Amino acid sequence: MAVVPIRIVGDPVLHTPTSPVPVGADGSLPADLPELIATMYETMDAAHGVGLAANQIGYGLRLFVYDCADDRGKAAHRRGVVINPVLETSEIPENMPDPDNDDEGCLSVPGESFPTGRATWARVTGLDAEGNPVELEGSGLFARMLQHETGHLDGYLYLDCLIGRHARSAKRAVKSHGWGVPGLSWLPGEGPDPFGH
């Protein structure tokens, strides 16, 4: 296990749909998958993220880890992994997102956040770390996280979901940081935290 660099917007691995994690006829998962999952958790924790998709650290495989609050109560918090997730959502609003309630950030767009329209409810089905079926659903931040991480695995970032002035602001931010090109990354725990944690 180790904290590894997180790829920044513009890296081709972030803009390419991931491949399903192979599952054996007996339901077995690849022998090296636990090590990848542990690395993903450690990297997400070091970055203070609520989720991390495998392609954000350079692996084109369909899985993500999460550590996210949900709306089931003040202390409700969920942590886990979803392998080969399939997403289902309520309708995504067509109106302009609310800057006060719909702000979203991403570890692959360090230090930036923009209002992003998302469905208020989401469910993901897939497999857990042992290859057992798992189903997660939620609303609020948890639903946003499920949509965000599954989007990564489908080859797009939340920036691709932005509309209007928010999309224009994001393009300016990417350009001003010199992002949008292959090969850029940042290492959580090294230098200033781009999110101010």
Swiss-Prot record:
Catalytic center residues: E149
Gene Ontology MF: a single term: metal ion binding
Cofactor field: Fe(2+)
Highest taxon, organism lineage: Bacteria
Catalytic activity: N-terminal N-formyl-L-methionyl-[peptide] + H2O = N-terminal L-methionyl-[peptide] + formate
SUPFAM superfamilies: Peptide deformylase
Record keywords: Hydrolase, Iron, Metal-binding, Protein biosynthesis
GO BP of this protein: co-translational protein modification; translation
Binding site for Fe cation: C106, H148, H152
EC category: hydrolase
EC number: 3.5.1.88
CDD domains named among the record's database cross-references: Pep_deformylase
Cofactor descriptive note: Binds 1 Fe(2+) ion.
Family classification: Belongs to the polypeptide deformylase family.
Purpose: Removes the formyl group from the N-terminal Met of newly synthesized proteins. Requires at least a dipeptide for an efficient rate of reaction. N-terminal L-methionine is a prerequisite for activity but the enzyme has broad specificity at other positions.
PANTHER family xrefs: PEPTIDE DEFORMYLASE, PEPTIDE DEFORMYLASE, MITOCHONDRIAL
Record protein name field: Peptide deformylase
Gene that encodes it: def
